[in-house]
C-alpha cells in the first residue's frame, strides 16, 4: 500500500512536470512541434525514458499531444496548462 501511494504521488507530480516542460520548450522554440526524444525529456526531468514514454502515451490518449519518432506535437496546450497548475 505504501509503495502504491508513493507511486501515485510521484506520478501526479511527474505529469505536472512533464506538462510544464513541454509548454516551456514550446515557448522557447516558438513552435508546438518539439524535436526532442523521450530520452532527452527524461534526462531534463531526472527520470527514466520508460517513465516519460508512459506519461507521453497517456497524454496522447487524452488528445493533448501526438507522438512520432523524435518529435512531440502539442495538440491541446490549454489542457497541458491546466494540468501543470
Identify the residue ranges that each predicted region occupies:
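Phosphate-/nucleic-acid-contacting segments
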Residues: 14, 23-85
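A small-molecule sensor/coupling module
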Residues: 1-13
Amino acid at each position: 500500500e505504501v509503495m502504491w501511494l508513493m507511486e501515485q504521488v510521484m506520478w501526479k507530480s511527474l505529469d505536472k512536470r512533464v506538462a510544464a516542460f513541454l509548454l516551456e520548450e514550446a515557448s522557447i522554440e516558438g513552435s508546438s512541434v518539439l524535436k526532442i526524444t523521450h530520452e532527452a525529456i527524461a534526462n531534463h526531468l531526472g527520470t527514466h525514458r520508460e517513465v516519460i514514454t508512459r506519461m507521453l502515451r497517456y497524454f496522447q490518449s487524452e488528445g493533448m499531444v501526438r507522438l512520432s519518432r523524435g518529435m512531440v506535437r502539442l495538440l491541446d496546450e490549454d489542457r497541458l496548462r491546466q494540468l501543470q497548475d
